[in-house]
Regions:
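A non-catalytic alpha/beta surface segment that caps or lines the substrate-entry region
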Residues: 12, 16-58
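Active-site metal-coordination/substrate-binding segment of hydrolases
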Residues: 37, 57-119, 129
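Acidic/histidine-rich catalytic neighborhood of metal-dependent amide-processing enzymes
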Residues: 95-175, 188, 196
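Zn-dependent metallopeptidase/amidohydrolase metal-coordination segment
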Residues: 187-233
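His/Asp/Glu-rich mid-to-C-terminal helical/loop segments that flank catalytic regions of hydrolases
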Residues: 217-279
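Short functional micro-motifs and their immediate structural scaffolds
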Residues: 291-295, 308-309
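Cysteine-rich micro-motifs
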Residues: 296-306
Length: 312
């Protein structure tokens, strides 16, 4: 049912250890589960998984990444439910461990949409946490018959990211989605690197967005998921997929990379004037002093420290 979480599937996802560079456990689970539901499933050489349900002239598409930052211990993860929250425990040591809501919440949201829509596509990417490796090499032909691409890969419960170092979607898409955001308690926001950024930069040609998924304190042992917030995200995504039936074409304006002696700059963190927010809200990196945009979980482009400890 679309109005409740499938606790069995969610529990299974949360119990799986999956680390950047070793996503095979999650990939095997998703392949087996989706094939068991009668869905068309393919996997590319990178390990990315592509799922199609039903037939449509243009599909809604949901994407997620299947790696987490947490190292695989081999002990598994025991999801522990405390009221409306769930966190992780290492069953061997009985110590709290990262539940991996980033992006297991997104994986669940994709499966939730597949279960509740007559026609839908989903893609699950490897190794987002180490630079959008999977989505950066995705089969772009998979998205040619899609209307838009949604991802649930952001902490919190209210952000609808339409800009990652440049817009992810057209004004028409944002205008059409705004009433749905208002009714579900979401707002437009800027964000940091995620798979939809890589898809945009690789020319998917349609509107993309990244959405708060109900997880908090990501990348830490104390990470937890607030289940009502995850359900809130799933309801929004279903509403968008059911309501917004047109194809939302979008091609971003070309941008020039800064002249800098560096092999690779993820576009989310180009150190150029158009991608930095030089406002009083911006905070300096406490490790190197570089001024950062006021955005949770940002990677410092100078010293590559992942998160400021003051934001933990």
């Amino acid at each position: 049912m679309s109005n409740v979480l499938n606790s069995s599937i969610l529990h299974s996802i949360l119990s799986i250890e999956s680390e950047s560079g070793d996503c095979s456990r999650m990939a095997d689970f998703l392949t087996t589960y989706c094939q068991g539901q009668g869905l068309a499933v393919t996997q590319d050489d990178m390990g990315n998984i592509y799922v199609t349900k039903g037939a449509a002239a243009a599909f809604p598409c949901i994407v997620a990444h299947i790696d987490t930052v947490h190292a695989i211990t081999g002990d598994g993860i025991l999801p522990v439910y405390i009221g409306d929250n769930v966190t992780g425990i290492n069953p061997a040591t009985m110590e709290q461990t990262g539940i991996g809501g980033d992006d297991k919440c997104g994986i669940y949201a994709a499966l939730h949409c597949l279960a509740n829509l007559p026609a839908c596509k989903a893609a699950f990417f490897v190794d987002e946490e180490i630079g959008c490796i999977g989505s950066g090499a995705a089969d772009m032909s998979f998205f040619r018959d899609c209307r838009f691409i949604l991802q649930a890969d952001r902490r919190g419960n209210a952000d609808f990211v339409t800009d990652i170092s440049g817009p992810l979607s057209s004004d028409r898409f944002q205008r059409d989605v705004k009433p749905l955001l208002t009714s579900h308690g979401f707002r437009f926001s800027h964000g940091a690197m995620s798979d939809v950024m890589a898809l945009r930069d690789n020319g998917c040609g349609i509107a993309c967005a990244n959405i708060s998924a109900g997880y908090y304190q990501p990348h830490q042992a104390c990470e937890y998921i607030h289940l009502p917030d995850l359900l809130k995200t799933c309801r929004l995504m279903l509403d968008i997929c059911r309501t917004m039936s047109r194809v939302y074409r979008f091609t971003p304006a070309k941008r020039s990379r800064p002249s800098r002696k560096r092999d690779f700059w993820p576009s989310s963190f180009w150190p150029s004037s158009d991608s930095w927010d030089w406002t009083p809200k911006a905070k300096p990196c406490e490790f190197c002093g570089q001024l950062l945009r006021d955005d949770d979980g940002i990677i410092c482009a100078e010293c590559e420290t992942f998160e400021l400890s003051s934001r933990l």
